[in-house]
Amino acid sequence: MTISNDVASKSSDLANKVIIHYCNQCRWMLRSAWLAQELLSTFDGDLHEVTLKPGTGGVFEVWLNGELIWERKRDNGFPEAKELKVRVRDLLWPDKPLGHID
């Protein structure tokens, strides 16, 4: 199966991409998948891509459009879903209400 050049070029130009880079050796895949689900549910249709990227060495990072918005070591632990949603919202749609989270 091939993707037409139009579709491929449009998808590569899309912004609003999240990458959750997690330590597979530490068994953090489920935590990463849960956070991805939370982001996709909250920003339904607004996020174009959420990627889970396995790694090693205790890594847990969340990237938004190439910008590091959460790092486990720097931020002293894992993000709560609420905090991660607020950071994403504040960077992409500062005026967007998050309902009961705000």
Where are these regions (language model features)?
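Domain-level signature for proteins that mediate thiol-based redox and metal-cofactor handling
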Residues: M1-D102
